[in-house]
Amino acid sequence: MNLALFDLDHTLLPIDSDYAWGVFTTTIGWTDPVDFNRRNDEFYAHYKAGTLDIHDYVRFATEAVRRRGVAEAHAAHSEFMRSVIEPAIRPEALALVRSHQLAGDMVLIVTATNEFVTRPIAQAFGVGELIAVELARDARDTAAGGSGWITGEIAGVPSAREGKVTRVSQWLQNRDLAWDDVESTFYTDSINDLSLMETVNHPVATNPDARLRAIAETRGWRILDLFPLSST
């Protein structure tokens, strides 16, 4: 089986969806813009430096959503998709995903952004298989058939840095597959994904940051400049 793995932010999207969602919550009045943007910028700087504590970040990033009910949160996300994400989806990225799907490859998006933010984005790309940071949920609404609501904690292994290798390995194991059973390609922009790039058969440095570009050039990895990037 051919397996095509895609990072999301700055790889398929020219923006960071997690960061953009945080900014969006300030525009709709859920968070104080000065305080939120200061903290958001600090976390984003840590992410780019490879020093992010993802557990602390997820508590922060889900704080505004956790104060809202399920219906209000999902309504806000629908507006986020309409006003922020859909205009950012580039035809080049859609065409790249479609080329793998048309070739019969299994396509997965593997992202360090949480599932609440990213599941509708994966659907917008026509990708049904998503590995994202899974969010722990409480018992609210479960008696009525609901899935509970976000607690701010992470469920299972976060799909960040080396955790991406673990999560993809688990995905394969759940299908009675191993890495040796698949011909794997991984597209990413970030040095944070170096472990997964070193695991797959065909790493593709896509819109790479300076450090990843240097490594890709040294190792002879393919470099793909898919589109110009936003600064966030």
Predicted features by range, described:
Residues 15-23, 70, 134, 158:
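Active-site phosphate-binding/coordination module
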Residues 1-52:
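Active-site neighborhood of HAD-like aspartate-dependent phosphohydrolases
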Residues 43-70, 130, 134-144:
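Short, compositionally biased "basic patch" segments
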